[in-house]
C-alpha cells in the first residue's frame, strides 16, 4: 500500500491532518534503528494486518529491526483494534477490560503506537529524542507539524512524540482497519447466506 496523502494535504486549515500524517508514519521504516522496519512490517495490510514473515522462531514471535533479535510476542492484527475501549477496571463485572493486547500492555491505540519504536527488540530506537530527530529530518513531517504548531514545538520531545502516537492511532481508525467484510458481515447485510452449521 502506498500513501495517498500529498505533502499539501498534511495540514488542513488550522488543524493537523492526523489521519493523513498517520498513514505516512505507519509505512515509514525510518522510525526503526536500521531503517528496515515500519509499523506495516508487522501489521501488513496485505495479510489482514498481521506479521506473515517467516523467521527462525517459526512465527511464534515477530522479528524486530535487528534480525538477530525477536520481539516478545507475535504481532496481533490491527484490524478492529479501534473498537477496544481504553484499559480500565469495570466495576459492574469486577474485572479489567479493554486496552490493546490481552495483558493490557497499552491502554489505547495511541499508547500502543508509541511502544514499538523504542522497544529494543522491536523497532529498536534508543529513545524518544532519537525518533523526534528523524521526524524533524523528514520534510513531510517537519513542514506539516511546523505549519500548525510552529518551530518551537520541536524543542519539546514529548509533545512531538505524542503527535506521532496520535497520528498513527487516528490512521488505525480508518475504515481500512474495519471493513466488516466476512461472510457473517455480508449475511447481516443480506448479501450472503449462512449454512445451517454457520448459523448455529
Where in the sequence are the language-model features?
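Periplasmic c-type cytochrome electron-transfer domains
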Residues: 1-200
Amino acid at each position: 500500500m502506498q500513501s495517498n496523502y500529498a505533502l499539501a494535504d498534511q495540514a488542513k486549515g488550522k488543524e493537523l491532518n492526523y489521519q493523513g500524517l498517520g498513514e505516512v508514519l505507519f509505512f515509514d521504516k525510518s522510525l526503526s534503528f536500521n531503517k528496515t522496519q515500519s509499523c506495516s512490517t508487522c501489521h501488513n495490510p496485505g495479510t489482514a494486518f498481521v506479521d506473515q514473515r517467516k523467521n527462525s522462531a517459526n512465527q511464534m514471535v515477530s522479528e524486530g529491526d535487528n534480525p538477530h533479535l525477536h520481539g516478545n510476542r507475535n504481532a496481533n492484527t490491527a484490524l478492529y483494534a479501534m473498537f477496544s475501549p481504553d484499559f480500565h477496571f469495570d466495576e459492574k463485572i469486577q474485572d479489567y477490560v479493554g486496552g490493546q493486547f490481552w495483558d493490557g500492555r497499552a491502554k489505547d491505540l495511541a499508547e500502543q503506537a508509541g511502544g514499538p519504536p523504542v522497544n529494543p527488540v522491536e523497532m529498536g530506537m534508543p529513545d524518544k529524542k532519537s525518533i523526534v530527530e528523524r521526524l524533524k529530518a523528514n520534510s513531510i513531517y517537519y513542514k506539516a507539524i511546523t505549519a500548525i504548531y510552529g518551530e518551537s514545538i520541536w524543542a519539546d520531545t514529548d509533545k512531538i512524540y505524542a503527535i506521532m502516537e496520535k497520528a498513527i492511532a487516528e490512521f488505525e481508525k480508518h475504515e481500512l482497519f474495519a471493513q466488516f467484510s466476512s461472510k457473517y458481515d455480508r449475511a447481516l447485510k443480506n448479501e450472503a447466506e449462512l449454512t445451517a452449521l454457520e448459523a448455529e
